[in-house]
Amino acid sequence: MREVISIHVGQAGIQVGNACWELFCLEHGIQPDGQMPSDKTIGGGDDAFNTFFSETGAGKHVPRCVFLDLEPTVDDEVRTGTYRQLFHPEQLISGKEDAANNFARGHYTIGKEIVDLCLDRIRKLADQCTGLQGFLVFNSVGGGTGSGLGSLLLERLSVDYGKKSKLGFTVYPSPQVSTAVVEPYNSVLSTHSLLEHTDVAVMLDNEAVYDICRRNLDIERPTYTNLNRLIAQVISSLTASLRFDGALNVDVTEFQTNLVPYPRIHFMLSSYAPVISAEKAYHEQLSVAEITNSAFEPASMMAKCDPRHGKYMACCLMYRGDVVPKDVNAAVATIKTKRTIQFVDWCPTGFKCGINYQPPTVVPGGDLAKVMRAVCMISNSTAIAEVFSRIDHKFDLMYAKRAFVHWYVGEGMEEGEFSEAREDLAALEKDYEEVGIETAEGEGEEEGME
């Protein structure tokens, strides 16, 4: 089997995780107590969903995941929630005091005490796997736990499981909506290790997802539950081919191979279509061409950045439901003729497509309409550099005055780490700039380079 272990770190990671496992259970017909009436083989079995769930002798399906937080409240929601019987109590790890939005607490002082326990639990999960494929890590980089403990854990996973790929689903700070004053510090420090220790990072940001909920689902005041359910659909589409059988299946390492042209350039934009409320879906015919087009709309992007300001290097389209390869090819051909969607000149093909026959599932009573087909796009675009430059700018404003730095130094960090991380990100912005420069023809640009 090609198993995948999911690791949910900090409040954002756990809440997104909750939405994901709720959706995975619905997709596979697994009840909140872990029983799966449709599954006839007791024990292991070589079913496709075993990549994400392990089976006990009693026929109970247990998610291959751990939830980690430095304070108990968010973990307690899982312990008392609908799916409390689904998880093994040892999979929910929480500390006593939180990271207080401080990267240094999550990475050095408090995180250090809990990280070995986390790795033990992960080792137990890994030992149950016959062919571990890699890890999915869910966190946000604005807070203290997601950024600090998340980074620490990624660094340790690189040591313990060197060759295994790590995909990050990372919630980045939004341009307007902020949850903490020190977000820019935490994000820069955390991205520094995401650069080195993840193979692919999918960037999400709350504001972009809020806007999608407001605009497409007519939810006036979206809650985190609305946001997370939408994010869960994206993650479900990306992992559908690991959990179901389909025509063009895509495995975790295939993402890397097709999306990452250079090791550092691995921050992805994602979008999902159709995001549509039940009232509207009834009146619309959503063809493959239409959902493909809307996946490329700047407004569909799950991070606040405009792909029209950059060029695409590669792009993965994961279709699910009633889709045939012929329609996909036609839709992609149309996209290629559009002038607004530009690819870098050194990557002429640029598209990888996957098709999975399992139609999209929605949470009953949720906001999304049940549709016949959906597409999730994950793309590598030079425009993502906007997200970094925005955070870097905020970082610079605070760091010039050394504001709030004493909180980090007091937890055992050195001031040099700030400048080191900041330089790394400056280099990353430059990398993105260089990748987008025309190679052969642009004469004028060459002169500007010298």
UniProtKB/Swiss-Prot annotation:
Protein residues bound to Mg(2+): E71
Gene Ontology molecular function: any one: GTP binding
A cellular component annotation (GO) from this entry: cytoplasm
Hydrolase listed as a keyword: yes
Pfam family, one: Tubulin
Catalytic activities: GTP + H2O = GDP + phosphate + H(+)
Keyword check for DNA damage: no
Active site: E254
Posttranslational mods: Acetylation of alpha chains at Lys-40 stabilizes microtubules and affects affinity and processivity of microtubule motors. This modification has a role in multiple cellular functions, ranging from cell motility, cell cycle progression or cell differentiation to intracellular trafficking and signaling.
Subcellular location: Cytoplasm, Cytoskeleton
Residue positions binding GTP: Q11, E71, S140, G144, T145, T179, N206, N228
UniProt cross-references to InterPro entries, sorted A to Z: Alpha_tubulin, Tub_FtsZ_C, Tubulin, Tubulin/FtsZ-like_C, Tubulin/FtsZ_2-layer-sand-dom, Tubulin/FtsZ_GTPase_sf, Tubulin_C, Tubulin_CS
Cofactor: Mg(2+)
Top-level taxon of origin: Eukaryota
E.C. number: 3.6.5.-
Keywords in alphabetical order: Acetylation, Cytoplasm, Cytoskeleton, GTP-binding, Hydrolase, Magnesium, Metal-binding, Microtubule, Nucleotide-binding
Residues with PTM N6-acetyllysine: K40
Enzyme class, UniProt record, top EC level: hydrolase
Gene Ontology annotations of biological process type: microtubule-based process
Similarity comment text for this entry: Belongs to the tubulin family.
Subunit structure: Dimer of alpha and beta chains. A typical microtubule is a hollow water-filled tube with an outer diameter of 25 nm and an inner diameter of 15 nM. Alpha-beta heterodimers associate head-to-tail to form protofilaments running lengthwise along the microtubule wall with the beta-tubulin subunit facing the microtubule plus end conferring a structural polarity. Microtubules usually have 13 protofilaments but different protofilament numbers can be found in some organisms and specialized cells.
Reported function: Tubulin is the major constituent of microtubules, a cylinder consisting of laterally associated linear protofilaments composed of alpha- and beta-tubulin heterodimers. Microtubules grow by the addition of GTP-tubulin dimers to the microtubule end, where a stabilizing cap forms. Below the cap, tubulin dimers are in GDP-bound state, owing to GTPase activity of alpha-tubulin.
Name the UniProt record assigns to this protein: Tubulin alpha chain
Protein species of origin: Oxytricha granulifera
